[in-house]
């Protein structure tokens, strides 16, 4: 296997991850993909393992199919590929079966669970379904009977998701992973499912403010690290998750829960640790200079992702230029060190973006990391 080298600019992110996490070999990425998507994204086994190796040679991941053109009938072919890839990964990958509620989901789910699938993936936007249906209820019954978690897309493109909360309340024994921090309806989920014993939220979120708000509303014991490969990178996602976790006041054992131990428990059929109260205040002071830089970076990221997969890193660069102008402030005050670090990451992102589309996600990862620093630095 050829390990993709970590771009030099990621070295400071990698160093901070080392400071914030004692055992990187225990990292478990809750949300990765393999195969081909209709949007053009693709990822093969060796490259996924290479991305995990950038974290640690022992890092692991949950994995499932993309919105594969070969998904009919019943996602059978993509599910078989994922099962085979996981078997070849020597214990580093936990395969989930992807199901379409409109295409024989129970028979396919039973088949995959019998072959070793460790969970179920549902994507209500891609498969255009709701949760107030007999098929959705039957899938929850399947997960309950099989003792496996369900990971559900709860990010962009979704309407209000109260029907899913209703279903979760009817099945308290089913472990749910709400992907993308449940940003489609985060406040509703955090309120209505606060007492659910096994609902967790993954951290594959592009906005640092959504991630901070997740830690402000949800106990640390209910948050699990995720990168959404191939749309993200584990090392960048882990940096963002751990930095926000530290900002939220999590100590080393709590950060270890987020990085892998909580997801390990769900996969083993155990309840996550008892929840503690979030410690991030609802109202938080910000440094105006860092807020300006961070706002430009969020706008740039939206422009890049709005271009459609694969993302166009060149579209973020006008906003990067504005953020770098903020970083050149001749009187930066207490924000000076953070602005200097942000400027270094953005300069490296410009260099990667100039190398072409193969480096686009690495460039965008650096922009995201810079945004996380802007949002979490404690300068006043």
Could you tell me what each predicted segment is?
Residues 35-37, 68-71, 101-104, 127, ...:
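Active-site environment of divalent metal-dependent phosphoester hydrolases
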Residues 31, 52, 82, 86, ...:
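Conserved, mostly hydrophobic/aromatic
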Residues 4, 73-149, 345-348, 352-368, ...:
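Active-site gating/metal-coordination segments in enzymes
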Residues 1-26, 30, 49-52, 57-60, ...:
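Mid-to-C-terminal alpha-helical segments outside catalytic/metal-binding sites
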């Amino acid at each position: 296997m050829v390990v993709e080298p970590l771009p030099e600019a990621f070295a400071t992110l990698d160093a901070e991850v080392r400071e914030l996490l004692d055992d990187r070999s225990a990292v478990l990425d809750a949300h990765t993909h393999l195969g081909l998507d209709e949007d053009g994204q693709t990822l093969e086994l060796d490259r996924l393992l290479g991305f995990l190796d950038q974290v640690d040679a022992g890092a692991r991941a949950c994995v499932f199919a993309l919105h594969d053109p070969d998904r009919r009938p019943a996602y059978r072919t993509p599910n078989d590929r994922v099962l085979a890839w996981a078997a070849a990964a020597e214990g580093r990958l936990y395969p989930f079966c992807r199901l379409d509620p409109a295409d024989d989901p129970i028979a396919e789910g039973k088949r995959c669970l019998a072959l070793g699938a460790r969970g179920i993936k549902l994507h209500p936007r891609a498969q255009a379904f709701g949760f107030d249906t007999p098929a959705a209820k039957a899938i929850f019954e399947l997960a309950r009977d099989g003792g496996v978690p369900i990971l559900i897309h709860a990010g962009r493109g979704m309407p209000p998701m109260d029907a899913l909360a209703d279903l979760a309340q009817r099945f308290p024994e089913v472990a749910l992973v709400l992907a993308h921090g449940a940003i489609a309806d985060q406040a509703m989920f955090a309120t209505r499912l606060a007492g659910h014993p096994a609902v967790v939220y993954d951290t594959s979120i592009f906005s640092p403010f959504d991630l901070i708000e997740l830690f402000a509303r949800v106990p640390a014991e209910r948050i699990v690290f995720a990168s959404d490969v191939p749309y993200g990178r584990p090392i960048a996602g882990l940096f963002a998750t751990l930095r926000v976790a530290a900002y939220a006041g999590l100590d080393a054992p709590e950060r270890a829960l987020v990085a892998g131990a909580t997801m390990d428990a769900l996969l083993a059929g155990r309840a996550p640790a008892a929840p503690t109260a979030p410690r991030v205040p609802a109202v938080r002071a910000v440094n105006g200079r860092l807020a300006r830089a961070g706002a430009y970076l969020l706008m740039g990221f939206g422009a890049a992702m709005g271009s459609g997969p694969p993302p166009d890193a060149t579209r973020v660069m006008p906003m990067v230029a504005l953020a770098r102008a903020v970083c050149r402030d001749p009187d930066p005050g207490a924000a000076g060190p953070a602005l200097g670090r942000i400027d270094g990451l953005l300069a490296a992102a410009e260099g990667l973006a100039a190398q072409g589309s193969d480096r686009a996600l690495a460039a965008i990862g650096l922009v995201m990391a810079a945004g996380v620093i802007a949002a979490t630095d404690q300068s006043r």
